[in-house]
């Protein structure tokens, strides 16, 4: 495998990679440190762009993914302009949809050396594994009144959503021979840590999501190796047996379909009914981007006890805040990512496309049915980070000839070491 050519300012690129890695490692530990690292990364990116703006080149595949997200961003503009507080909506638009996306842009534009990409992913898997293991410490020491592990961040569902991305990635890295040894070593720890985290976090939504995405991500590898299939089945049955032998887990599983006495489920349904009324009142552009909290009290049912801060559903929340226009943009964006990644994987079997598919399916579509994952800052940054790294790793293999081009661009049409494009 060869390294993707990158701009001549090699030290700046190295510092940029370090800043991004540091940002991802402290993302759920210190907001201040994360924002500082992000600011430094953006500054380095601007310097690199200014010095190399005439020679920067992206693959057609990455451009297409970026354009699809751009369509979604455009669909949000009407809900900003017609909001009862356009300034607040504009601020929310930048913070929620632009600033969190920056990490994707920085990686796909500037981090083109496979060594850096592998190091970034290795560091991310290692830190997240430690956080997942920390949930066991929380449980054993009764650190939370609800008896659940939240990791380094107080948001329980946030960690649950992240693990829905983490487990498929780690398992595929372990099973696919393309990945480097040190990445596989971190993946071993990551699989173990995530399984512990899933048990200690006790997110029912995460359990159900993993039942969908893990088989999809690992199917081709398990089909080829019966020993591997038996090992995975043994681990699954062992975990299932442990859960069924524990009254607290049995109760947790049984509560999945309880929509009456389980307030978590019942309040979500009431909030969704409120959203239905919101959409009826403002069907085209919604109540305004980022204006849910201000408007929800007018629509909230008295029976809803938790005073939810969002709709706990990606599609319903976007429909309420951004109307049919915003929902259509979201469906196009997600549909494009799912269709393109699955189509590319079927054409040329590789770990990168199937992981892009399962990450988007699991985090946004499935876990996003019970939580507003699009609004979770650390979760979305991790999603964009993972997608960018995976797509860039795929590019390194495309340029080495191991994966045929999905875009029709030949290897002769890529930048050389100086950043110049040769055709």
Where are the language model's segments positioned?
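Membrane-interface catalytic loops of GT-C/OST-like multi-pass glycosylation enzymes that act
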Residues: 87-92, 146, 153-156, 201-206, ...
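A membrane-periplasm/extracellular boundary helix in multi-pass inner-membrane enzymes
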Residues: 196, 200, 221-263, 273-281, ...
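Transmembrane signal-anchor hairpin modules in multi-pass inner-membrane enzymes, especially those
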Residues: 1-88, 112-122, 173-185, 226, ...
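Transmembrane alpha-helices of multi-pass inner-membrane enzymes
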Residues: 40-46, 333, 355-369, 373-413, ...
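Hydrophobic transmembrane alpha-helices and their immediate junctions
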Residues: 219, 226-228, 322-365
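Alpha-helical transmembrane segments of multi-pass inner-membrane proteins
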Residues: 20-24, 74-77, 102, 115-144, ...
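Hydrophobic core segments of transmembrane alpha-helices in multi-pass, intramembrane catalytic enzymes
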Residues: 34-45, 91-104, 157-173, 206-217, ...
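Long extracytoplasmic/lumenal interhelical loops at the membrane interface
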Residues: 145-146, 259-273, 277, 281, ...
């Amino acid at each position: 495998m060869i390294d993707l050519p990158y701009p001549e300012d090699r030290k700046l690129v190295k510092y940029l990679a370090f800043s991004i890695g540091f940002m991802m490692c402290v993302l759920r530990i210190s907001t201040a440190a994360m924002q500082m690292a992000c600011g430094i990364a953006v500054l380095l990116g601007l310097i690199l762009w200014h010095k190399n703006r005439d020679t920067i080149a992206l693959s057609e595949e990455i451009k297409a993914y970026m354009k699809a997200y751009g369509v979604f961003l455009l669909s949000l503009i009407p809900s900003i302009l017609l909001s009862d507080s356009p300034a607040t909506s504009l601020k929310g638009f930048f913070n929620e949809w632009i600033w969190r996306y920056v990490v994707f842009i920085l990686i796909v534009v500037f981090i083109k050396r496979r060594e850096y990409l592998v190091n970034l992913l290795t560091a991310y898997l290692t830190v997240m594994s430690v956080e997942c293991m920390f949930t066991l410490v929380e449980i054993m020491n009764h650190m939370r009144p609800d008896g659940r592990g939240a990791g380094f961040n107080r948001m329980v569902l946030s960690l649950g959503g992240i693990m829905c991305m983490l487990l498929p990635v780690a398992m595929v890295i372990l099973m696919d021979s393309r990945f480097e040894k040190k990445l596989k070593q971190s993946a071993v720890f990551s699989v173990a840590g995530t399984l512990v985290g899933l048990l200690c976090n006790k997110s029912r939504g995460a359990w159900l999501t993993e039942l969908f995405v893990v088989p999809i991500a690992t199917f081709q590898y398990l089909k080829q190796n019966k020993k591997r299939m038996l090992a995975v089945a043994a681990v699954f049955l062992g975990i299932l047996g442990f859960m069924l032998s524990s009254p607290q887990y049995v109760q947790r599983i049984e509560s999945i379909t309880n929509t009456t006495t389980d307030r978590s489920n019942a309040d979500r349904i009431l909030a969704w009914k409120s959203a239905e009324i919101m959409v009826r009142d403002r069907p085209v552009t919604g109540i305004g981007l980022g204006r849910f909290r201000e408007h929800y009290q007018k629509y909230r049912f008295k029976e809803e006890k938790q005073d939810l801060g969002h709709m706990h559903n990606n599609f319903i929340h976007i429909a309420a805040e951004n109307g049919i226009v915003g929902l259509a943009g979201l469906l196009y964006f997600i549909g494009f990512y799912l269709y393109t990644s699955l189509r590319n994987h079927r054409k040329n079997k590789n770990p990168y496309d199937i992981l892009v598919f399962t990450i988007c399916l699991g985090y946004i579509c499935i876990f996003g049915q019970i939580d507003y994952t699009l609004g979770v800052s650390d979760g979305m940054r991790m999603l964009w980070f993972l997608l960018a790294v995976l797509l860039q790793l795929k590019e390194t293999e495309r340029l080495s000839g191991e994966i045929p081009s999905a875009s029709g661009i030949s290897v002769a049409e890529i930048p050389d070491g100086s950043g110049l494009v040769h055709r």
